[in-house]
Amino acid sequence: PKDRRVLLDLGHVLQPNWGHKLVGNEYLFVNDSTVEGTIRTQGWAHFHAVSYRITFSEPIETLYQYIDGNLRKDSLFLRLNTPGDLKFHYKFAENNKPLYVKVAISPVDTDGAERNMLAELPGWDFDATRVESAHIWNKALNDIQIESSDPKVMVNFYTALYHTMIAPYAYQDVDGRYLGMDKKVHRAEPG
């Protein structure tokens, strides 16, 4: 493909009409294929932060950054901290290879996101990751089985079962660190 781009929208928030808003955006260009940062919001939760690390399978060729819809002319930066609506367009070299993107998050910090990525997705084998993910979900969804001749009943049941497995959730790093209700970092005991 001639125009290989990825848009990273760090200004989007869910339910802005309910008062959920962006209050901080930290961004770091780690190297030519890795970025990381922390997004801070307020609204449904008084204070909510998500740290992330994003690694591309190829170097970023060109970077365009926008704050509040305006293209910044000084796009050659390493670190940025703004409460503004922050978006990036990453342009990659023209070729026919697939572009892979790995994303990890942390409730604590970018170091946690990096450790989570290394522990949970160390390689670049997309097909193996897809197969492993399908196996994990199939095992979980097959723990309870129902019978019905109505496909709608089956879809409804297994969709509801899937939903029970994604929320509520334990949100912590692979090393057990998490951000408590007191906004301090704690460590969960293994097990």
Give residue spans per PLM region.
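Beta-sandwich/jelly-roll carbohydrate-recognition scaffolds of carbohydrate-active enzymes
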Residues: 1-191
